[in-house]
C-alpha cells in the first residue's frame, strides 16, 4: 500500500531519534494521517504477509468484551501473551472499555451497543465515538490502549471510520491496526445496512523501533501488489454474532513474511 510506504519514508526522512519506555530506541514523528478507500480493496499490507487470522480473532475478542487471553490462545493467537498475568488476565483493556466502560455512578456503558444504535437512529450525529482511554483505569491495564479512540461518520449511504492512535509501532502494529479497523468498519456497515466508505488513520507518536530499521527498508524495496478483497459470507444482523468463518479473504498475494521482535 502506497500510504504505508509513504508513512515509512516520512518517518525515516523527518523523524527524530528518541528513547522510549522499552529501552529499544525509536525514530519518531508526531502527527500523521493516512486515508484508505474501502471500495478499492481491503487494506491488508502486501509488502509482507500478515496473519489475518490473528487480526480477526483479536477483533472478535474485543467485541466480546473479553480481557483474558484464553480465547486467543485457543484459536492460535499469541499476540497478547507477553502482557498477560499467570491467569491470562490483562485487566481493563480494550474489550472492557468498549463493552463495559465504568461510569461515575457505578454503572457501566456498552459503547459498542450504543454506537450501533446511534448509527441506525441518528446517523448525522457527531458523537459516534468509542474511547478505550479511561484515565481512571489506566493503572488497571496490562498495557494502556495504543489505538485509543475512534469515530464513525455516515454520508451518502456510506460508513467511514477515523481512528486516533496515540502510539504507533510502524513495523509491527500499524499494518495490523489498519486491517483491524477496516474490518470493524465493514462489519458495522453490514449490520447497519450501509456501504463501507473510508478508513482514516491518524497517528500521534508514529515510530520505527531501531531494531526494525532493516525490516522497514526491506519493505520499501519491495513492489506494492494489488489489494485483496475481504468478503463477508453471511447476512449477519448483530455485530456480536460474527464468527471467524464469516470472513473470506480473496486474491491476497503478498511478499513473504518478515519477522521482527516485539518491544515489551
From Swiss-Prot:
Positions annotated to bind dUMP: 21, 126-127, 166-169, 177, 207-209
An example Gene Ontology molecular-function term: thymidylate synthase activity
Protein location: Cytoplasm
Keyword Cytoplasm (UniProt): yes
Top-rank taxon, per record: Bacteria
Pathway connected to this protein: Pyrimidine metabolism; dTTP biosynthesis
Cellular compartments per GO CC: cytosol
Keyword match ATP-binding: no
Keywords: Cytoplasm, Methyltransferase, Nucleotide biosynthesis, Transferase
Active site: 146
PANTHER family named among the record's database cross-references: THYMIDYLATE SYNTHASE, THYMIDYLATE SYNTHASE 1
Function according to Swiss-Prot or TrEMBL: Catalyzes the reductive methylation of 2'-deoxyuridine-5'-monophosphate (dUMP) to 2'-deoxythymidine-5'-monophosphate (dTMP) while utilizing 5,10-methylenetetrahydrofolate (mTHF) as the methyl donor and reductant in the reaction, yielding dihydrofolate (DHF) as a by-product. This enzymatic reaction provides an intracellular de novo source of dTMP, an essential precursor for DNA biosynthesis.
NCBIfam families in the record: PRK01827.1-3, PRK01827.1-5, thym_sym
Assembly and binders: Homodimer.
Family: Belongs to the thymidylate synthase family. Bacterial-type ThyA subfamily.
Protein name: Thymidylate synthase
Organism in which the protein naturally occurs: Bacillus pumilus (strain SAFR-032)
Lineage of producing organism: Bacteria, Bacillati, Bacillota, Bacilli, Bacillales
This protein's encoding gene: thyA
